[in-house]
Amino acid sequence: MATQVFISCDTELSALLYQRGASARANYDASITGRTTAGDYGIGWQMDRLEAHGLKGVFFVDPMPALVHGRQIVTDIVGPILSRGHEVQLHVHTEWLDFAPTN
């Protein structure tokens, strides 16, 4: 019998990059797209690798940056994952509460 494996990936913007003044786009490019001088190695690359082997992954997405950047940034993360047939689950980093504007 083959070994069953559950592949998951924490998918989140960097609170440290935010603290250092990175724009939402720069944070997305670094943290989600995984942009490097050698190419992109983020969630798109990860899904490509999984799909090349007939696999699907589970991406644990942190929605908390929406408190700072708005909901669209989370939609931009979740959309490609779901459109490619992968799974999205909840992953939370509460430090974003410290950055959220007060009501």
Describe each PLM feature range.
Residues 1-103:
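Catalytic alpha-helical scaffold of carbohydrate-active enzymes acting on polysaccharides/glycoconjugates
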